[in-house]
């Protein structure tokens, strides 16, 4: 069973990096990558059904 929370965090960190931001720089009191969590969650949730088809 995939660890969805870890996948969402990894995706958020990747989205942050691809936008050219350091992952752990502070933004509104939290690491910058956390501001990408909503987008990462949408992407992972969209992909999961296709990964589970096998």
Feature locations, PLM:
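Amphipathic alpha-helical segments that form the core helices of the histone-fold
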Residues: 26-48
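Amphipathic alpha-helical oligomerization segments
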Residues: 2-25, 46-54
